[in-house]
Amino acid sequence: MSTDSILNPQSAVDIIRSRTVFVAGAGVAGKGIVAMLEGIGGNFKVVDDRAQVADLNTAEAIAAVSSAETAPALLITSPGWRPDSELLLAAQAAGVPVIGDIEAAWLADQAGAFGTPRTWIAITGTNGKTTATAMTTAMLQAGGLAAVSVGNIGTPPGAALVADERADYLVAEVSSFQLHWAPSFTPDTGVVLNLAEDHLDWHGSMAGYAGDKLRALRGPRPVVAVDEQLVRELAADNGVPNVVACSMQDPAEVLAQAHFPLVVGVVESEAGAVITEVATAENGELQVTPIASAEAISPPGPAGIADAVAACALVRAFDVPPVAISQALHGFEVQAHRGQAVHLAEGVIWIDNSKATNPHAAIAALGGLENIVWVAGGQLKGAEVHDLIATVGPGLRGAVVLGCDRAEIIRELAAQFPDLPVTEVSNTDPEGAMAEAVAAARTLAAPGDSVVLAPAAASLDMYTGMAQRGDLFAAYARGTGAEAGTSEWEGES
């Protein structure tokens, strides 16, 4: 059954103001939805199985939507609710429109419920979303624009609309879950950074996953990472118009290969790599605009530069000057667990990329680094690791593998790189396992090496989330033990 429930902005606001709305989920996203509904003056009921934070539990809500007398006029779901959950299926069967938090906030904003509509920027992809979102927000702010990060990081989108200090630019990190429930969401500009098999149990197929991601490109200025074959083909096959290209290649060479109105890429020179914009003028000549040095970007390596290039391509739509972009980029500090350098001692750098929860993310995390001691393992969720090992193996000094699916990684390492030193950590205590892993990595590492936590797997086999896993890695790397390993759960989207 289709999940699309198309509403126009004004009709959505009219429903909220005059009829009953159900909000599925009372977590962070749900609270943001509630804040927005209260700002509009809506009548709503929160659905959650935690009685202390809800008006209805799931069973009660299913009964309500199944009756014409008690069914809501609209159901707004938090992104964690699966399309095949009984409540959402019951709502759709009853003809109740189902939308997500991004869709609801965008509709309310476009209707003018909170003043002049804002500018929306959507950033999605299998990996790199958070860093690219934070970079984009920092660049806009450096250019003097009132911008805030919303969605998976920063402020829930609904809460951003009712904030005391208005933001004119909403930079939304949007997961495939959120886009799934956003049938009419049309950002002013958006980017798909990359695509790899992920969350297929949620979306049902790679086609479903990719189709949901494509919704970020429906605006008038879509940005496409043309180095990524799946992204490039997705945009081409679906006829996405007016594509702005971002690439790690020389932008003039990209422009020569295909027609784009504008390309942002990387130009190598004797002074180092420079992020550069190239466009074709009306007279056919190339207009070349150097934007910022690509040297010393955080996080280090190609993945960090790729995120910076995408962010530059997005903000140039709003005439942010290169000097402001450069200032923001070189003052930027990566968020925790996303390639953050957490310790440096005896010539060895320790890097926490606990957010690399799938093989594609691990490849990005390790790319560009040499002499790596790799700390890996956790829940693979059925992901294949053959290509991952083939890609990263040549750069490894050694590996330390822990977690419930460690045997598969160890087996593949032995098959492809039989001489590589590999330490297995069988301890299943969260703190004990990480303490052993860090101790083993310290033994393997030599001056000039990088010890990188890039698990290629989810963390919930042992940890409360990827944040706790990364915190413990950093704490033991610094020699402070488990005292920092107390972060609350953080989801892995």
Swiss-Prot record:
Pathway noted in the entry: Cell wall biogenesis; peptidoglycan biosynthesis
InterPro entries hit by this protein: Mur-like_cat_sf, Mur_ligase_C, Mur_ligase_C_dom_sf, Mur_ligase_cen, MurD
Protein task: Cell wall formation. Catalyzes the addition of glutamate to the nucleotide precursor UDP-N-acetylmuramoyl-L-alanine (UMA).
Family classification: Belongs to the MurCDEF family.
Lineage: superkingdom: Bacteria
Protein name in the entry: UDP-N-acetylmuramoylalanine--D-glutamate ligase
Lineage: Bacteria, Bacillati, Actinomycetota, Actinomycetes, Mycobacteriales
Subcellular location: Cytoplasm
NCBIfam families per record: murD
Subcellular location, principal: cytoplasm
BP GO annotations: cell division; cell wall organization; peptidoglycan biosynthetic process; regulation of cell shape
GO MF term set: ATP binding; UDP-N-acetylmuramoylalanine-D-glutamate ligase activity
Organism: Corynebacterium urealyticum (strain ATCC 43042 / DSM 7109)
